[in-house]
UniProtKB/Swiss-Prot annotation:
Protein name per the record: Phosphatidylserine decarboxylase proenzyme
Compartments in which it is found: Cell membrane
Enzyme class per UniProt: lyase
Role noted for this protein: Catalyzes the formation of phosphatidylethanolamine (PtdEtn) from phosphatidylserine (PtdSer).
GO molecular function: phosphatidylserine decarboxylase activity
Example GO BP: phosphatidylethanolamine biosynthetic process
Originating species: Clostridium botulinum (strain 657 / Type Ba4)
Amino acid sequence: MIKYYNRRNKDYDIEKVAGEKYLNWTYSSPIGMNLLEVFIKKKFFSKIYGFYCNKRLSRKKINKFINDFGIDMSLSENQSSNFKCFNDFFTRKLKKEARPVKADKNLLISPGDGKILAYKNLNLNSVTEVKGINYSFYELINNDSLAKEYDNGTCLVLRLCPTDYHRFHFIDNGICENTIKLKGFYYSVNPIALSKIPSVFCKNKREYSIFHSENFGDIIFMEVGATCVGSIIQTYKPNTKILKGDEKGYFKFGGSTVILFFKKNTIKIDNDILSQSKLGYETSVIMGEPIGSRK
């Protein structure tokens, strides 16, 4: 059971997890854990499932997925009958009015839909994940000199579950450098898995780029792959002018994570998100929603 904070009704909700029985079995049973290490965490497994999700045959999953998880298709640019395959549906674009972006340059917005955690006064040797698991920022970035620039800064971890909108966006005007790709495995990023596999973010396939934002300084913008995420697709054009709310890229099928790192004294995160993070609870947000402000 995954409990998260709903800031709209100021109460806790229970997340409806896609493939919950499979996740619990895989990460809780000896046989499941053996399969995970031998097969499921490998790129080959995610490529096989990704291949299926790109085929027309996978269309039969779409309507059941929509009904099971109550996905509001009135927000989508296309309706279910127009998608060519499950991945086409999964990476769907939303109508612009579905995710309005406030122009106020002082407002910090969420880069995507999902559940967010925030950590300030970043300790480079120990960043806390869901369920209290720690990992090293140095190991995550694999660049010690760059990591040191973010000492005592702020970290935002946005977890996208399979039922979420899976495109991620820029949070400010600016210019983004080329993407750096780091090889890794494909463990799930669901809290069920995070509690069983230490330092998942450091072990999984991930990509990051430096975003030179106009109002929040230089931001490390990282995407982390997960089980069945065959691809992290970057759609932005590096080293060109970017506007707040522009699409940066998207994940193909699976749960995934976006992580942002800010330098010291550049942003202030909303109190409800910070307080819930301290308690160990994620907060649900949508792309474009204000989550903080410029210092």
